[in-house]
């Protein structure tokens, strides 16, 4: 059974070029593996009233059902009518806010987190372009976590009441929403398994392998990763201390499985990474 860790990475669609998305269009080299020095201020996210056409979006097959007729696509286009820009380190929504919409990520990456009893932010997931955030708000009409942009991002706003109405008329859309919700349940079960049974090496290997899997689904490189989360955030998600994450990255590099240059990771020996998992084919 396959499940997904919501690790997050963005690279430009290219067969061999390494790209630093902190500066779009710029090829990554030794001097620009760093993240962009974008503003860290928590300025509010900016609504952006640009008409969005799902029918023309390159990510359509990732966040929308396939096989829709032109009429069905036009009806969805009419519902998903605006984009919203979110600055780096700014929240798309916060825990406790009223739930209004789901958000399909067009560009950028997000982390979801909850406030732990000791005041720390506990990372519960990472989301990338083509994925949907906001599902947590459906059950009680309010969000139960924060969704924070790890880089400047843009989302499509999907008003839930209108999506719900349309899904009752367009069977493929309803089925797709059910699949998205089911996938989130499976993901949460997978994370529980990871935290409860896997050693540190297995957790990090599963995390990196998941990034590769998600990149391939988008036609990106299967080996060049630019991580958008910090190692501390990775540790929070995987239930590991920062020192353990850093030590495990170093071990993987020393053993020739990966090459690491700050946030740039190159998978050198994917089969050895897979071999670290105690149960081949287990959740990753």
PLM features per residue range, with description:
Residues 89, 100-113, 129-130:
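Glycine- and acidic-residue-biased ligand/ion/polar-headgroup-sensing regions
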Residues 91-97:
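Short phosphate-coordinating micro-motif centered on Lys-Gly-acidic
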Residues 123-190:
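Cyclic-nucleotide recognition modules
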Residues 32, 213-284:
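Phosphate-/nucleic-acid-contacting segments
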Residues 32-88, 132-133, 137-139:
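Cyclic nucleotide-binding regulatory module and flanking cytosolic helices
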Residues 168-241:
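Polybasic "coupling" helices that flank or enter modular domains
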